Amino acid sequence: MRIILLGAPGAGKGTQAQFIMKKYGIVQISTGDMLRAAVKAGTKLGQQVQGIMAAGKLVTDDLVIALVKERIRQEDCKEGFLLDGFPRTIPQADAMAEADIKIDYVLELVVPDEFIVERISGRRVHMPSGRIYHLKFNPPKITDKDDMTGESLTLRKDDQETTVRERLLEYHQQTMALVDYYRQRAKRGDTKYFKLDGTRTVNEVSQQLSSILGES
């Protein structure tokens, strides 16, 4: 089972990726982790990546595709994999198709922007302990104070509304065309595309996934 999981930051991809991995026994392939692992392993491709990154340049699509091909040949990918963070663009998706990397399912978690903004910008964190609160869904007993220590809570920069909206804009600019690309491929029978309602509870989304992917 080879899966691409699409969704905006804050749509719940991480939670559902863990569910898929556990239920179906497949591994998650993150391009960031893959690049770091290749450099650490010192493979020929890894040495190329290290040189490019050391020069402050972006790793080319061709090189990332070569790394993906190398990664999916490994034993732990025998039952399948879940691609995280790749492809992001149509040229990357085309390069995957040209490299004969077949994808069984493209799953898109859809959540309205305002829902995501509320979900993320409402977070407050007690930095020393890592405890996370939410102004609406899990508020502290005293506003902006940690329940255990009474210390101040922090709104992280990544959780600020302006930052969230910038990330959402970038996501939509990159991904709208990619979603249409995979819808067209699904119509041709090259893959299967499904859109899921990410505003539902975690369990409800997981149930949607189970009905699509089948029981393990």
Swiss-Prot record:
<dbReference type="InterPro" id="IPR006259">
    <property type="entry name" value="Adenyl_kin_sub"/>
</dbReference>
<dbReference type="InterPro" id="IPR007862">
    <property type="entry name" value="Adenylate_kinase_lid-dom"/>
</dbReference>
<keyword id="KW-0418">Kinase</keyword>
<feature type="binding site">
    <location>
        <begin position="10"/>
        <end position="15"/>
    </location>
    <ligand>
        <name>ATP</name>
    </ligand>
</feature>
<feature type="region of interest" description="LID">
    <location>
        <begin position="122"/>
        <end position="159"/>
    </location>
</feature>
<feature type="binding site">
    <location>
        <position position="123"/>
    </location>
    <ligand>
        <name>ATP</name>
    </ligand>
</feature>
<comment type="pathway">
    <text>Purine metabolism; AMP biosynthesis via salvage pathway; AMP from ADP: step 1/1.</text>
</comment>
<dbReference type="GO" id="GO:0004017">
    <property type="term" value="F:adenylate kinase activity"/>
</dbReference>
<dbReference type="Pfam" id="PF00406">
    <property type="entry name" value="ADK"/>
</dbReference>
<dbReference type="GO" id="GO:0005524">
    <property type="term" value="F:ATP binding"/>
</dbReference>
<comment type="similarity">
    <text>Belongs to the adenylate kinase family.</text>
</comment>
<feature type="binding site">
    <location>
        <begin position="132"/>
        <end position="133"/>
    </location>
    <ligand>
        <name>ATP</name>
    </ligand>
</feature>
<protein>
    <recommendedName>
        <fullName>Adenylate kinase</fullName>
        <ecNumber>2.7.4.3</ecNumber>
    </recommendedName>
</protein>
<dbReference type="GO" id="GO:0005737">
    <property type="term" value="C:cytoplasm"/>
</dbReference>
<dbReference type="Pfam" id="PF05191">
    <property type="entry name" value="ADK_lid"/>
</dbReference>
<dbReference type="InterPro" id="IPR000850">
    <property type="entry name" value="Adenylat/UMP-CMP_kin"/>
</dbReference>
<feature type="binding site">
    <location>
        <begin position="57"/>
        <end position="59"/>
    </location>
    <ligand>
        <name>AMP</name>
    </ligand>
</feature>
<feature type="binding site">
    <location>
        <begin position="85"/>
        <end position="88"/>
    </location>
    <ligand>
        <name>AMP</name>
    </ligand>
</feature>
<keyword id="KW-0067">ATP-binding</keyword>
<dbReference type="InterPro" id="IPR033690">
    <property type="entry name" value="Adenylat_kinase_CS"/>
</dbReference>
<keyword id="KW-0963">Cytoplasm</keyword>
<comment type="function">
    <text>Catalyzes the reversible transfer of the terminal phosphate group between ATP and AMP. Plays an important role in cellular energy homeostasis and in adenine nucleotide metabolism.</text>
</comment>
<dbReference type="GO" id="GO:0044209">
    <property type="term" value="P:AMP salvage"/>
</dbReference>
<feature type="region of interest" description="NMP">
    <location>
        <begin position="30"/>
        <end position="59"/>
    </location>
</feature>
<feature type="binding site">
    <location>
        <position position="92"/>
    </location>
    <ligand>
        <name>AMP</name>
    </ligand>
</feature>
<dbReference type="InterPro" id="IPR027417">
    <property type="entry name" value="P-loop_NTPase"/>
</dbReference>
<feature type="binding site">
    <location>
        <position position="36"/>
    </location>
    <ligand>
        <name>AMP</name>
    </ligand>
</feature>
<feature type="binding site">
    <location>
        <position position="31"/>
    </location>
    <ligand>
        <name>AMP</name>
    </ligand>
</feature>
<feature type="binding site">
    <location>
        <position position="200"/>
    </location>
    <ligand>
        <name>ATP</name>
    </ligand>
</feature>
<comment type="subunit">
    <text>Monomer.</text>
</comment>
<keyword id="KW-0808">Transferase</keyword>
<keyword id="KW-0547">Nucleotide-binding</keyword>
<feature type="binding site">
    <location>
        <position position="156"/>
    </location>
    <ligand>
        <name>AMP</name>
    </ligand>
</feature>
<keyword id="KW-0545">Nucleotide biosynthesis</keyword>
<feature type="binding site">
    <location>
        <position position="167"/>
    </location>
    <ligand>
        <name>AMP</name>
    </ligand>
</feature>
